[in-house]
Amino acid sequence: MKTLVFGGKLVNEGATRVASVVVDSDTITDIIEGTETPRGDYDNIVDATGCFVMPGVIDCHVHFRDPGLTEKADMETESRAAAYGGVTTYFDMPNTKPQTTTLEALDAKMNDARSKSHVNYGFFIGATNDNIDCVTAIDPHLVPGIKLFMGSSTGNMLVDRQDVLHELFEKAKLPIMAHCEDTDIINRNMKRAQELYGDDPAVKHHPEIRSEEACYESTKRAVALAEETGARLHVAHMTTERELQLFGTSPRITAEAVIAHLVFTHDDYARLGTRIKCNPAIKTATDRDALRHALTDGRITTIGTDHAPHLLKDKEGGCARAASGMPMVQFSLVTMLELVDNGVLSMERLVELMAHNPAKLFEVSKRGFVRKGYKADLVIVRPDAPWTVTKETIQSKCGWSPMEGHTYQWQVRTTMCNGHIIYNNWAFDSASRGEAVRFRE
């Protein structure tokens, strides 16, 4: 099938210009600048006049809960939410049941995704104290990288032996994506909070327990290991101004920001409670503003969601009882477009952070850019198209979002994955299936 996307402003590789994109089957075959509609025989013509066209979002950080935790979410429901949000590729984390820490578990997950996932997929292999030989010998074409928990979080995959950490950083040929929080500091803070506030301290104390110090000390340790060994380190979900001081000097040591930490502050616990409880914790307005500034100065290189659905019953309680994590994949792009409107970053920088840089960092094969010969993963977004998040519009299986009630001015109008329009104006092709992403080819 031959498709023409015309009339829109193409945002790609640092420039915005009116251009048409020609797609044949699953591949971009031509990019034609100018306002004139190209002539030709097309099976499908998409009018993007008044809209912006950009490469589909690559979300490097999701927890789709499949396998083993599918009462909360699964690949089918969450990849549908991704498509509604303009996300055409996701990389899923390994803290599932079973954990993705063996080749057998990775193969099973890949096989499951073939029949379930509506958009393209990749899966991190997880490091443990006992599987370093496995993760350092894995086929580099199969996975984006190695996920390392240097702080204890959902799934109990903490790697806390210093000899194992050093060996991993020395041997790893793939990027290491690290969750950095110091568990000893967190445990001390929790003990102190429980002495003061009871067994289950209110969620407003979450950033005191999973504190700036806990994040900084662990991140500093990871950066030092990467500097010593030459490992390619990408630190997940920055939350503090202090941590950001460790970045910006080495192209092999980079950092991610996620949507929750760019939008919310600790003041929002009063309004949203445990719905915004996540690890690492949302911190101060000063920290949030520092993260926003780092989007444009090079210290933050990718935007993810850390999409981590839970049932609302699992979010009951406080710091000790309530589960950490929130669904966000459906709203990442429109939220970042709001930051564009607010002058935080340019549209071109948004595309770098959400498509180009993830593709470059993890060496994604033929995705992440609008280029001839690349896979036709595109998203069309429309400005000045207000809509409000309601229970009915939320696609995640858990059925809630901290963004519920929020009115966006931007709307994802169309999502194209591998040349096929899977989402258009609230209509979704449930028969669509994505592809396994290949790396380093």
Q: Which residues does each PLM region occupy?
A:
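Histidine-rich, glycine-flanked metal-binding segment
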Residues: M1-L4, K9-P55
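Divalent metal-coordination and catalytic microenvironments
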Residues: G8, V21, D26, G50, ...
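Metal-associated gating/positioning segment near the N- to mid-region
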Residues: T49-K116
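Histidine-centered catalytic micro-motifs
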Residues: G56-P67, M177-E181, M238, T305
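A glycine-rich helix N-cap at a beta->alpha junction
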Residues: N111-A127
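Histidine/acidic residue-rich metal-binding segments in metalloenzymes
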Residues: D133-I303
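His/Asp/Glu-enriched, well-ordered alpha-helical/loop segment
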Residues: D200-R221, L225-G230, T296-I303, A308-P383
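C-terminal cap of metal-dependent C-N hydrolases
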Residues: K372-R438
